[in-house]
């Protein structure tokens, strides 16, 4: 069975359509866990009628706790071997789960599945993401799957949106959800799962990614991604108890990043943040320090 977790917060205009896209799935062995994070609109009233289907469960927070806490609440009730994420403003095509199950059957060793997306919604918002999505697709087309994508995604994001991802439940249980930036919980999870698990990419537009100005996407920026990257490395180091193995672990990522983005990016992003997070005293660089 697949457990689908949808977090809800003031998306009453979209949530019904999102739920209907789950009900339309050709693969029927699923449960949908909706966690409403104290919406102030009529989201809960929109969701309740769908709970007549016993596969759909609604959980409500009495106060707003944020995305990470909402996901944690959903995971407490999840029974599936796999966890799929579907944001409350996105949609799936009718064969989304079926295609993912086929991938699992063909590659049982994988721990992460992701697929291509169809962007839709506000015209300007769609145009804003189109070029970047096309570049990512070109890169993915040159890669062979299944593969471990940990170092790939630390150089640049290859996972298009949260609603396009499904992860193995056992792998997710080992993942800390203590992201320093709530809006980037998806990125935090991707890094953790990718560290020890192979991924498989489905080159089909199985997720419909809605673009609008109230989306989480518009609360994200490059500096935030970098901060989450480093924090995730430290978290993995602690969870996996890497000890002295941490140095080659971080060194490989540093070398790849220097090669890709240059020395200044390495110093500002990696050295400074590792210094801050680990309390390591490093001599300032007159070349790069502001």
Question: What is each model feature region?
Answer:
Residues 21, 28, 36-45, 63, ...:
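A conserved acidic beta->alpha catalytic loop
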Residues 16, 41-49, 91, 95:
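Acidic helix N-cap motif at the loop->helix transition within catalytic regions
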Residues 61-78, 99:
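Glycine-rich, basic loop-to-helix element that forms the pyrophosphate-binding segment
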Residues 11-24:
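Short, well-formed alpha-helical segments that are part of the catalytic scaffolds
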Residues 76, 136-222, 229:
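Conserved nucleotide-sugar donor-binding catalytic segment
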Residues 83:
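Short aromatic/hydrophobic "clamp" motif used to bind/position activated sugar donors
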Residues 1-2, 23-34, 42, 54-57:
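Short loop->beta transition adjacent to catalytic acidic/histidine clusters or analogous donor-positioning motifs
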Residues 67-69, 97-171:
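Flexible acidic/His/Gly-enriched loops in nucleotide-sugar-dependent glycosyltransferase catalytic domains
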């Amino acid at each position: 069975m697949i457990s689908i977790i949808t977090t809800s917060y003031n998306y009453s205009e979209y949530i019904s359509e999102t739920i209907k896209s789950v009900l339309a799935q050709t693969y029927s062995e699923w449960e949908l866990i909706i966690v409403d994070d104290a919406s102030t609109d009529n989201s809960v009233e929109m969701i309740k009628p769908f709970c007549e289907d016993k596969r759909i469960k609604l959980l409500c927070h009495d106060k707003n706790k944020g995305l990470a806490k909402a996901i944690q609440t959903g995971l407490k009730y999840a029974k599936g071997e796999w966890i799929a994420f579907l944001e409350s403003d996105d949609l799936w095509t009718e064969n989304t789960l079926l295609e993912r199950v086929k991938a699992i059957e063909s590659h049982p060793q994988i721990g992460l599945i992701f697929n291509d997306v169809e962007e839709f919604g506000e015209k300007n918002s769609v145009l804003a993401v189109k070029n970047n999505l096309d570049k990512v697709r070109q890169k993915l087309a040159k890669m062979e799957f299944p593969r471990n994508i940990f170092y790939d995604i630390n150089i640049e994001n290859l996972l298009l949106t949260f609603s396009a991802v499904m992860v193995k439940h056992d792998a997710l249980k080992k993942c800390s959800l203590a992201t320093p930036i709530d809006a980037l919980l998806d990125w935090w999870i991707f890094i953790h799962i990718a560290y020890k698990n192979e991924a498989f990419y489905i080159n089909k537009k199985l997720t419909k990614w809605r673009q609008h100005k109230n989306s989480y996407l518009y609360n994200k920026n490059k500096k935030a991604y970098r901060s989450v990257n480093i924090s995730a490395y430290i978290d993995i180091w602690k969870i996996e108890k890497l000890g002295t193995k941490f140095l080659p672990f971080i060194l490989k990522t540093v070398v790849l990043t220097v090669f890709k983005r240059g020395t200044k990016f390495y110093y500002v992003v990696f050295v400074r943040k590792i210094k801050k997070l680990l309390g390591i005293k490093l001599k300032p660089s007159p070349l790069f320090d502001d």
